Amino acid sequence: MKEPVFTGAATAVVTPFRNGEIDFPAFEHILAQQLEAGIRAIVVCGTTGEASTLTPEERALLISHAVAYCAGRCKIIAGVGTNNTAQSVRYAKQAAEAGADALLAVTPYYNKASQEGLAVHYFTIANATSRSEERR
């Protein structure tokens, strides 16, 4: 039987700011606390991490920083959810290139999508990276 990709607890972390900029020392402190507590996965750039207010550059930096800092000691789940499928695909590709272990997408908000539209949204994001085959 194939081993599960994730086990144990995961934490969705906040994105600390100081003077309008990401506070990377504080971010590392948050990551260190989670690792010391035995957390098995960390969600970066989810709603708790202020994903909707981050620039694309900030999002890419946070995910890359988390992957590098955690260095395989836990899984990194990268938030790629937006109201725009094409933008979520771009974020998914960036996250995969940075080494994120999984993606977190959201249902498009403010638009009432059909069930077929929702399926297309999620499948498009899921199939956007070369790692898509790993989940099958």
Predicted regions and their residues:
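Conserved, mostly hydrophobic/aromatic
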Residues: 21, 34, 66, 95, ...
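Conserved small/polar residues in nucleotide/adenosyl-binding loops
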Residues: 134-135
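Catalytic cores of alpha/beta
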Residues: 84-95
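Active-site mouth loops of central-metabolism enzymes
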Residues: 9-26, 54, 76-86, 110-115
